[in-house]
């Protein structure tokens, strides 16, 4: 019997900000078998999830991930967006 796996691209990114825990958990609740995501290394060698190598599009910050420490990245909000407003603030 054939089985078709459902992959959630950046989580349930149509319903929650991409690559956030909210998007990943919602994808699972919606029945996704797996999540596709991208990872990058920070300036201090930590692994973070983000599609772009620049954080401007998906956060309230600017700059390249590779130039920022994890502590710096944690100071930005990756949950707010014009699409979702305040609903996922702080993700």
Predicted segments, located by residue:
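Conserved beta-strand positions in the central sheet of alpha/beta enzyme cores
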Residues: 7, 35-36, 49
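Short, acidic/polar
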Residues: 16-26
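Conserved, mostly hydrophobic/aromatic
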Residues: 9, 27, 38, 73
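Metal-dependent phosphodiesterase/phospholipase catalytic core, i.e.
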Residues: 4, 51-91
